[in-house]
Amino acid sequence: MEYVSGGELFDYIVKNGKLQEHEARRFFQQIISGVDYCHRHMIVHRDLKPENLLLDHNMHVKIADFGLSNMMLDGEFLRTSCGSPNYAAPEVISGKLYAGPEVDIWSCGVILYALLCGTLPFDDEHVPTLFRKIKTGIFPIPEYLNKQVVNLVCQMLQVDPLKRANIEEIKKHEWFQVDLPSYLFPSNIEQDSNVIDTYAVQEVCDKFGVKDTEVHNALLSEDPHDQLAIAYHLIIDNQRFADEAAKAEINNFFVAGSPPPKL
């Protein structure tokens, strides 16, 4: 288990109120990077909120509390109404079927609003009234928010899940793209399926107490839900993520260390 010393993003918002746009964007980019990672590995969180987003000593966001998360299966839908009411999507509180990613997108939209405004878009002490507000999808838009971010928030807080922005649309949005660190979305380099990383295999063996032949068999089975195969690919992804982050740090170092231009 990892110790995260910076506390909850919720406490940070309570202490600081609405954040400067550049800081809100930096947090939001990291949140979307983490949610995208979960969704690519067929996991839907279902309880995203600032209380479940932790900050490390470098003020990097860590997604926590997967107690209500679920695995997504092709062609199957979820119905369970779960999560915190203020961050729950209309289809969740209405007991409708949902695929999964779209409810996390709604929650991320609420979080983005909270980062920028210091308040929630939908709030009421009376739960039935709160639910009515969520189902209408109508919320106040402060005048100080720029048009780009208002456009993004509105796309994410679409009542109709079919019209709601998806991860790819968020990643391509002009507001989201500003100062976006490349390591948050490392390039998806296709690997030769015949080449197996022996380091990653050994790490899986150490963590699960299995033999390397079992890991090889899991990879050859091509079962997307095999825990050994999932662990292997997580290790590969984490290594690629770390490599991209290291490259970004080196680039930033050389840029910062460049001599000033001659006058």
Describe each region flagged by the PLM:
Residues 1-180:
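Eukaryotic serine/threonine protein kinase catalytic domain
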Residues 111, 259-260:
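A short, hydrophobic secondary-structure junction motif
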Residues 162, 168-259:
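C-terminal regulatory tails of eukaryotic serine/threonine kinases
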